[in-house]
Amino acid sequence: MSGAITCSAADLATLLGPNATAAADYICGQLGTVNNKFTDAAFAIDNTYLLFSAYLVFAMQLGFAMLCAGSVRAKNTMNIMLTNVLDAAAGGLFYYLFGYAFAFGGSSEGFIGRHNFALRDFPTPTADYSFFLYQWAFAIAAAGITSGSIAERTQFVAYLIYSSFLTGFVYPVVSHWFWSPDGWASPFRSADDRLFSTGAIDFAGSGVVHMVGGIAGLWGALIEGPRRGRFEKGGRAIALRGHSASLVVLGTFLLWFGWYGFNPGSFTKILVPYNSGSNYGQWSGIGRTAVNTTLSGCTAALTTLFGKRLLSGHWNVTDVCNGLLGGFAAITAGCSVVEPWAAIVCGFMASVVLIGCNKLAELVQYDDPLEAAQLHGGCGAWGLIFVGLFAKEKYLNEVYGATPGRPYGLFMGGGGKLLGAQLVQILVIVGWVSATMGTLFFILKRLNLLRISEQHEMQGMDMTRHGGFAYIYHDNDDESHRVDPGSPFPRSATPPRV
């Protein structure tokens, strides 16, 4: 704990006279005991804060489940819900066995960790069980992102394989590069050993979590191909509407709530005073991070609302929800190191990026039921670039440790080195995830383990794979959920049963 009490006989000699040594030993011993109590209390408070943040991040799994369920057709609800449960369950086991060691095991050459497999020799002087739990919650978030991209057409065994591989190997390697003190691009390395003298700044994971999940989903959806009926023979897009906007909104609010553990919780400690003043410390940085997260998401939501209104002619709640989440995904990298006004810029541009990526996806006939690759991959990449433009020198030194001459945001007068490091991060994440997850999805396809049959896809996986529908009554998915691109109304005039 900073500001520890110090005491010695020499300090007290002028006050205690002839008996200075004996009295000083006693007094210093008592003060040492008090100091240890304060240190223990600070450690307990920091761990409690981290555990609370881990619980919030884990609650995002419920948000992902609701968002996914509402975004697919009713006939595939049980399937997508089960995959979300297994993302957490399989991810928990594989992150325990391998993932944490690869990510934070230490003693590496900058590429991958080599210790603490199955939490052996754990806890360590630098990490307790609360840190493992927090990082596991992050790992399964990446897997949850990917599941949305390949929804409604993927074999169940493929989910198990890709989720285990992603959380046990692919994601941990990336998190080691940028978050471990040993990582080759980490900002926590010694000053003279950092990438471009700064390291890549990805505070809570626009790249490490969102881009990894989004790029993995991109390859899965590309290799599988679009859902049946998503595009007509002439290339005209047909929107396959999700069956419940209510679940989408519920999932969005749960994710919003969890993001206050995702971003502010990434400080991992709260009782860290800064040198700027006794009443100013990490608790202030945590508050600023929460405010920046809020402003970016809100700005992206409103920008998407009016942008989509101009493009489609109607107000669409699911588009607004995706815009909100895109703003959150983008600010995640720089939430701790930018001013609140910059977070508004981040959210505005995140909405523009998301809308643009969705237009491009339609042009190339790319089908992603939850827009996960566009939202998490595209907005995550923008978030990394945003840091290179708007990161503030003062906040970088507070969050990552004071370093004379540390590069900071280009638009803030800090030169282009940080932006260069951010671009390198984007490139290596795209390359690594493409090489690993793209190869895995290709192998699964060649082994006929990736996509379900056309008959099962048309009938719905709930009936053909999971023993029955999620609801006693459900809509006729093939008709009522097919929507002309320019209309908010389904083709079928038959009202849905409830």
Swiss-Prot record:
The chain crosses the membrane at residues 50-70, 85-105, 131-151, 156-176, 203-223, 247-267, 315-335, 337-357, 370-390, 423-443. The modification Phosphoserine is found at residue 487. Keywords: Ammonia transport, Cell membrane, Membrane, Phosphoprotein, Transmembrane, Transmembrane helix, Transport. The keyword Cytoplasm does not apply. InterPro entries: Ammonium/urea_transptr, Ammonium_transpt, Ammonium_transpt_CS, NH4_transpt_AmtB-like_dom. GO terms for molecular function: ammonium channel activity. It is found in: Cell membrane. Induction: By nitrogen deprivation. Highest expression at the end of the light period. The modification Phosphothreonine is found at residue 464. SUPFAM superfamilies: Ammonium transporter. Residues 479-498 are annotated as: Disordered. It is a multi-pass membrane protein. Its main location: membrane. GO terms for biological process: ammonium transmembrane transport; lateral root branching; lateral root formation. One of its GO terms (cellular component) is ammonium transmembrane transporter complex. Highly expressed in roots. Expressed in root tips, root hairs, root epidermis, rhizodermis and cortex. Belongs to the ammonia transporter channel (TC 1.A.11.2) family. Ammonium transporter probably involved in ammonium uptake from the soil. Contributes with AMT1-1 to the overall ammonium uptake capacity in roots under nitrogen-deficiency conditions. This is Ammonium transporter 1 member 3. It comes from Arabidopsis thaliana (Mouse-ear cress). The lineage of its organism: Eukaryota, Viridiplantae, Streptophyta, Embryophyta, Tracheophyta.
